[in-house]
């Protein structure tokens, strides 16, 4: 696995921030997504001042969080980890010591498990606004009830999250607009939408949080074969 050079990340981050400034997105929070990269990507992000990191897989998040702690990061000053992938309920207990924000809560069973292992946690509801069967997320008409149910568990529901449709700018913009409308109706301030390939569309639609991986760290290394 290639080593991530913090200088390269800093250069890409400067370019990204310049791009965001040009499209009115200077207020948008960046979640640095280290999926598929080694712990050095997380360390490089921290070196560049990126304090919010995102992971898609439970095992990767736990391993990187523990690596940073072992390398000398104090738990109080360690990065804020967001879990942004599809999550099985049985993984919650192992992640609870590390995760600050659970971005992909899409069913009550998962919320109940989070409330049991990490009471009062910050959560976002993932919504499948593109109606693609292969994607996780609750349906738009289910959002209001799920938010109410999660709130009744004393979870801190702060926003909504979605993934756009790949390769279709018009449909992605429509999906992002739909998410913003849902968040507005529910008075939820955070709209986590937009990744490396569609962040400009997301910002135009009203994103408050981008999940950025390859735009910061370069192409992901190929998965190791057994």
Place the predicted regions along the sequence by residue.
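Conserved alpha/beta-domain cores
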Residues: 1-189, 195-197, 203-205, 217-219
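Gly/Pro- and small hydrophobic-enriched strand-loop and loop-to-helix capping segments
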Residues: 207-225
């Amino acid at each position: 696995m290639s080593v991530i050079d913090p200088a390269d990340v800093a250069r890409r981050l400067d370019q990204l921030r310049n791009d965001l400034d040009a499209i009115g997105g200077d207020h948008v929070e960046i979640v640095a997504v280290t999926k598929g990269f080694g712990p050095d990507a997380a360390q490089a992000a921290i070196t560049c001042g990126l304090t919010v990191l995102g992971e898609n897989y439970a095992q990767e998040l736990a391993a990187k969080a523990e690596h940073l702690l072992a390398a000398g990061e104090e738990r109080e000053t360690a990065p804020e980890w967001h879990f942004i992938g599809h999550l099985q309920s049985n993984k919650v207990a192992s992640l609870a010591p590390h995760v600050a924000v659970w971005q992909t809560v899409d069913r009550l069973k998962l919320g109940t498990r989070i409330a049991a292992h990490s009471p009062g946690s910050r959560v976002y509801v993932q919504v499948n606004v593109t109606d693609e069967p292969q994607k996780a997320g609750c349906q738009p008409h289910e959002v209001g009830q799920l938010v109410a149910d999660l709130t009744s568990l004393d979870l801190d529901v702060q926003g909504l999250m979605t993934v756009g449709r790949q390769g279709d700018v018009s449909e992605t913009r429509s999906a992002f607009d739909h998410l913003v409308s849902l968040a507005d109706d529910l008075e939820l301030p955070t709209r986590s939408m937009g990744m490396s390939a569609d962040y400009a569309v997301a910002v135009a639609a009203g994103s408050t949080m981008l999940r950025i991986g390859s735009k910061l760290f370069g192409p992901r290394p190929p998965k190791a074969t057994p």
